[in-house]
Amino acid sequence: MEQPVIPVRNIYYMLTYAWGYLQEIKQANLEAIPGNNLLDILGYVLNKGVLQLSRRGLELDYNPNTEIIPGIKGRIEFAKTIRGFHLNHGKTVSTFDMLNEDTLANRIIKSTLAILIKHEKLNSTIRDEARSLYRKLPGISTLHLTPQHFSYLNGGKNTRYYKFVISVCKFIVNNSIPGQNKGHYRFYDFERNEKEMSLLYQKFLYEFCRRELTSANTTRSYLKWDASSISDQSLNLLPRMETDITIRSSEKILIVDAKYYKSIFSRRMGTEKFHSQNLYQLMNYLWSLKPENGENIGGLLIYPHVDTAVKHRYKINGFDIGLCTVNLGQEWPCIHQELLDIFDEYLK
């Protein structure tokens, strides 16, 4: 069974939703990209992002700078000053703050460009653009990037567009692995990893609902087990139930479970059935939900379309249950409209 076939442009759109940067989708003309894989798209978007930031003016910040200078400025480094006999010449080794472009965000961007340039299968035009941008950042140092560098920027003062560019950097860095040639990289085959794509699919659908279903409230709900024990310690061992998506409209509470599988069906003794564990999980969520004012409650299992388009609706144990697919292989405006139609139908 093949995995869902999703064009790389649509994977980029899904990433942009998952990162929370819906507005930036419109700023990248993906039709103009010379390459044809996800790395080429991300490299193209990064180049355009760095160019736009440079035109706006890269962010500045005060950074400690140590120099041999005439007189005194800031803090004197006494040991270095005495050891170098600088006082004999009326000079000191001083450390003082200097306003420049050598900030953490800019270092991350330049360091990512350095990695991008060394990718073995990157489109040559995109590589040349990245190399040109790298050379235009001489006052910015590079880093051996780690997850901690990106975590330092979370919630920082960077502008929204800076944060978008950093998100692209983070994805490129996290999916760059050593290539066959020393000092080079190859891009991890992200879209072929079912676990990674499943996480992306869940995040994408959550952000889509949160941003596009403006008349409803989209959250992730934490549900409590209807359980008792002789000790609180025993209860604490129970796993936490968290929904992928909970949508509350004026008419209904809809719990959505996003499942990214090679097939929506399991086969046993020659007969196709929906995956039982998915339906059991959804039903458990519904049984655990405690409506406060007699709200109408329903559930929806939504899969990517692989080989069969599915749209079914049932009444199970008094709950309105839907199982459907969305075709992620079509043009993006069609995906957008299909999802709106699905949620509009199942929220009624």
Curated annotation (Swiss-Prot):
Q: Molecular function (GO) terms listed?
A: type IV site-specific deoxyribonuclease activity
- What does the entry give for GO biological process? DNA restriction-modification system
UniProt keywords (A-Z) are: Restriction system
The cross-references to Pfam families, in alphabetical order and at most eight, read: McrBC
Q: Name one GO cellular component term.
A: endonuclease complex
Which superkingdom? Answer: Bacteria
Q: What does this protein do?
A: Modifies the specificity of McrB restriction by expanding the range of modified sequences restricted. Does not bind to DNA.
Name by which UniProt lists this protein: Type IV methyl-directed restriction enzyme EcoKMcrBC
